[in-house]
Amino acid sequence: MIRRLLIAPIRFYRYFLSPWVGRQCRFTPTCSAYAIEAIERHGAWRGLWLAARRIGRCHPWSPGGYDPVPPGHGAGAQACCAHRHRTEPD
């Protein structure tokens, strides 16, 4: 529920305000797409933190480029981690 409330103004910006302003983002995916994905993948608080950090890096002096949302703690994160973790000390 909170995720939807946080994503709604971002979608409003993407569909109604962004076409008037023009493409200003220096990153791929755009900051608004990054924010939506971060909130969906990491939840409200961590997603907002990641989105705020990304927006803070998006300025004219930034080199920009490809900057994906980091993997979450679910199955996607386990897929990128090939080694085993110990759960108990030996």
UniProtKB/Swiss-Prot annotation:
GO cellular component: plasma membrane
TM region(s), chain numbering: none
Main localization of the protein described in the UniProt heading: membrane
Membrane topology: Peripheral membrane protein
Presence of keyword Cell inner membrane: yes
InterPro entries the record matches: Membr_insert_effic_factor_YidD (IPR002696)
Function, in words: Could be involved in insertion of integral membrane proteins into the membrane.
Family assignment from sequence similarity: Belongs to the UPF0161 family.
Pfam families named in the record: YidD
Name of the featured protein: Putative membrane protein insertion efficiency factor
Keyword entries, A-Z: Cell inner membrane, Cell membrane, Membrane
Location relative to the cell: Cell inner membrane
